[in-house]
Amino acid sequence: MQRVTSYLPAGTPSSNPIDRVELPHDLRHLRRKLLHLENGEMVMLDLKEPVLFANGDLLVREDGELIEIVAAPEKLFEIKPRNRLHLIELAWHLGNRHLSAQIEEERILILRDHVIRAMLEGLGATVTEVSEPFQPARGAYHAHGGHSHGHDHGHSHGHDHHDHSHD
């Protein structure tokens, strides 16, 4: 069985994957896992640190061959606002509830939740059930937990940190 110990970000030039693995958003945060490829083969993902993979990222097998990460279609709500200001207001309400959301110019996608749907419709949004890939925005608290920048540095950014709780 082939092992995967590295990856390349989506859009890497001159990359031709030999296979794909389709995963929903909640299964794309990985470090070590046996992955079942579309062709029926399996590979062992074995990374040094967890990575939050995006649609189109490429896993690099030990033999150099590439496997594409594909965002699986998921049952979502498509939220359409009245205008751009309304979209910002709706996004604020979703963020205030710590919900994963894919925010686009003219719509927001979230996982289906009928309580949230009622709230959004009460705020004047049009909410429709859709099934499509989900790539939620990465939150501020996850800023250093996704893709590596290829170098190490301290995270002090020139200021003191004051620990506090949001409880």
UniProtKB/Swiss-Prot annotation:
* UniProt entry tagged with the keyword Chaperone: yes
Region entry Disordered: which residue ranges?
A: 137-167
Sorted UniProt keywords: Chaperone, Cytoplasm, Nickel
Classification of source organism: Bacteria, Pseudomonadati, Pseudomonadota, Alphaproteobacteria, Hyphomicrobiales
Q: Specify whether Cytoplasm is a keyword of the entry.
A: yes
- Put simply, this protein is called Urease accessory protein UreE
Gene3D superfamilies, alphabetically?
Urease metallochaperone UreE, N-terminal domain (2.60.260.20), UreE, C-terminal domain (3.30.70.790)
- UniProt cross-references to CDD domains, sorted A to Z: UreE
- Domain of life per record: Bacteria
> Where is the sequence biased in composition, kind Basic and acidic residues?
149-167
GO BP terms, alphabetized: protein folding; protein-containing complex assembly; urea metabolic process
Per the record, the similarity remark reads: Belongs to the UreE family.
Protein purpose: Involved in urease metallocenter assembly. Binds nickel. Probably functions as a nickel donor during metallocenter assembly.
Q: Name one GO cellular component term.
A: cytoplasm
Under Gene Ontology molecular function, one entry of this record is: nickel cation binding
Q: Which residues cross the membrane?
A: none
Q: Where in the cell is it found?
A: Cytoplasm
Which gene does this sequence derive from? ureE
